[in-house]
Structures are given as structure tokens and as C-alpha cells.
Swiss-Prot record:
It catalyses: D-altritol + NAD(+) = keto-D-tagatose + NADH + H(+). SUPFAM superfamilies: GroES-like, NAD(P)-binding Rossmann-fold domains. Disruption phenotype: Deletion mutant cannot grow on D-altritol. Does not exhibit a growth defect when grown on D-galactitol. It comes from Agrobacterium fabrum (strain C58 / ATCC 33970) (Agrobacterium tumefaciens (strain C58)). Its EC number is 1.1.1.407. This is D-altritol 5-dehydrogenase. Pathway: Carbohydrate metabolism. PROSITE patterns: ADH_ZINC (PS00059). GO terms for molecular function: oxidoreductase activity; zinc ion binding.
Length: 336
């Protein structure tokens, strides 16, 4: 089979590889759509995961079951599925508390185990979810959307009927837009998208979102006006800039992945006096079913975030250089 393979740190190739054997409890998935995420780039450069090279990247993927092991009864050949990539141990302190995304030895398809940038992928059957007739390119958004769901749950959005009056999201890339659209779907009347790129803001506006230029004087005048503010850029100064914009009693969600050594300055008295909630969110925590439910109703608009659907042979450049076109959003491998 053809696959993108990270053969060593910083080196990705298009390879011809054998299809792996099918162990008990597993299914062979014929990959139909697989999305590129910045985490894939971090894996390539050994900034994320345990540096398990060689490895096939890709943790946002959907496909058709091609075969199942003899002990698998839940799925059969021909079933249409999406993959939950996280592989927690199930026994550590975090797993016992239900925080599988914080597993002390967390593994994942596309990070420590071969993933979805290949024609076929061997996956544990209990990590598959049926997608019915949902288009594959839409279903492949389930994993990043599940990360969004985990973030909203961590922040208490929608829990016990709690819905902020308004929200602000920094970073009009695919994940930031997924978050903003999901906030709207939860009933938040006004969701504002902040970015420095005018074309991305225009796209966000076309999706029905309010927009603001990040770092602008106009935005700074909205101090203490947003009940919920999230950073989806992973840029520390942007994350720091959230705090003054949060309304009294509001919530700031650290959703983007800042560098491990990045630092921000926050006044503890301000958190205390204004009763602010600072919330972190990492990955997904068995949220694929909730993500699929959102895609059933909002999949058409969210699918607009998929800007490229390419064969494997055209995917490699997106792993090795940052796209210069701001119109590039979610790039997916689409089976020919």
C-alpha cells in the first residue's frame, strides 16, 4: 500500500509498505479521508509524542472496514467508520478518573502507532464509530471536533444549561473556526472570531461569525465584555491577551498548543477579584459520538473548512512547508 511515512525526525516520504497483519480485536480500515493537523508536523519534528519512528501519521480519519479479525462482531466488512485515535492505558490515575486524554502513557494512532495517511490502517475495533451515510470528508472532522467538545465541556459550556451570552475566539484557522461554530451551535448568540488575517476573517464572516482584528484598538476597547474567550492560536502573547477581555465571572480557555517553555503574565489578584475561570483543554476524551452528533446537524457548514482534498501523492508538501495561501484551511487526503 502507499503511505506517508515519517522515517526519522524531520524526514517524511511517500512509501510503498506492506499492509499490516490483523491481530485479534482489530479491523482493517480502507482509509477514505484523513485530515492534516499541526500535531502531525509536531510529530514529524519530535515535538509531540515519544518519537516513535518510523510511523505513519494521521489521527483524523474515516474509512470503510475492509476486514475484521475473527473475534470482532461489532463491525463487518463494508461498514463506514471513523477512528478515535487515542489509546489510553485505562489503569493510571487519570484514566481511573475518566480523564483518558491525560493518561500518563497516552498513545495514539498517527503518533505512536501507524495512522491514517495510508491506503489502509489497522485499528482496534473498539476505537471505531459507525458514521452511517455521512460523507467521509465530513466524518474525518470528528476528531478535531471532538477536541472542541472536550474543550467546551472543560469550560462548562452547555453544562447544566449554562450558555454564555457572547464569546470570542482567537485564531481563524480550522480548529478555531470549528470551536466558534460549535459555540454557536450550543446557543451562544454572538460569537466573534479574532485574527490578523483579513481574508480569514472574511471567510469567518461568511460562515456567520462576527469578526475583529486581533490586537486592534477596537478589540482592546471591548475590555471585560466577553463571557467566554478562547485562544486557538497557541501563541503565548495572544493567550495572555485573553484575560483583560474576559467579563467579570467569565472563562478563558487555553485551547491552542503553546510551546512548552512559553510563559505569560497574569495578575492573581485580577483572577481573584473578578472571579475568573482559567481552563485548559488537551485532546479529546472519548468525545467522538458527541462530535458526530454535531456533524449530523452542522456538518454542511463545517465541511466548508475542508479546502483541499488530495491524493496521497500530493500530500507530502503540506508536511514539509507551511502553506502561504491563507485560504488553505483543512487539508485532507481523499482516496482516489
Amino acid at each position: 500500500m502507499h503511505a506517508i511515512q515519517f522515517v526519522e525526525k524531520g524526514r517524511a516520504v511517500l512509501a510503498e509498505l506492506p499492509v499490516a497483519d490483523l491481530p485479534p480485536g482489530h479491523a482493517l480500515v480502507r482509509v477514505k479521508a484523513s485530515g492534516l493537523c499541526h500535531t502531525d508536523i509536531d510529530v514529524l519534528h519530535a515535538r509531540y509524542g515519544d518519537g516513535a519512528f518510523p510511523v505513519i501519521p494521521g489521527h483524523e480519519y474515516a474509512g470503510e472496514v475492509a476486514a475484521v479479525a475473527s473475534d470482532v462482531t461489532v463491525f463487518k466488512a463494508g461498514d463506514r467508520v471513523v477512528v478515535d485515535p487515542n489509546l489510553p492505558c485505562g489503569t493510571c490515575a487519570s484514566c481511573r478518573k475518566g480523564l483518558t486524554n491525560l493518561c500518563s502513557t497516552l498513545k495514539a494512532y498517527g503518533v505512536s502507532h501507524n495512522g491514517g495517511f495510508a491506503e489502509f490502517s489497522v485499528v482496534r475495533a473498539d476505537h471505531l464509530h459507525g458514521i452511517g451515510s455521512m460523507p467521509y470528508h465530513v466524518a474525518a472532522l470528528a476528531e478535531p471536533l471532538a477536541c472542541v467538545v472536550n474543550g467546551m465541556q472543560s469550560a462548562g459550556i452547555g453544562e447544566s444549561g449554562v450558555v454564555p451570552e457572547n464569546a470570542l475566539v482567537f485564531g481563524a484557522g480550522p480548529i478555531g473556526l470549528l470551536l466558534a461554530l460549535s459555540l454557536k451551535s450550543r446557543g451562544i448568540a454572538t460569537v466573534t472570531m479574532a485574527d490578523i488575517n483579513e481574508s480569514r476573517l472574511a471567510f469567518a464572516q461568511d460562515l456567520g461569525l462576527q469578526t475583529a482584528v486581533s490586537g486592534s484598538e477596537a478589540l482592546s476597547r471591548q475590555r471585560k465584555e466577553f463571557d467566554f474567550v478562547a485562544d486557538a492560536t497557541g501563541i503565548a502573547p495572544v493567550a495572555e491577551a485573553m484575560i483583560p477581555l474576559v467579563a467579570d465571572g467569565g472563562t478563558a480557555l487555553f485551547f491552542g498548543v503553546c510551546a512548552p517553555d512559553a510563559r505569560i503574565s497574569v495578575a492573581p489578584f485580577e483572577i481573584f477579584r473578578r472571579q475568573l475561570k482559567l481552563v485548559g483543554s488537551h485532546s479529546l476524551n472519548r468525545n467522538i459520538p458527541q462530535a458526530l452528533a454535531i456533524l449530523e446537524t452542522d456538518g454542511e457548514v463545517m465541511a466548508r473548512l475542508v479546502s483541499h482534498r488530495l491524493p496521497l501523492s500530493e500530500m507530502l508538501p503540506f508536511f514539509t512547508k507551511k502553506p502561504s495561501d491563507p485560504a488553505t484551511m483543512k487539508v485532507q487526503f481523499a482516496a482516489e
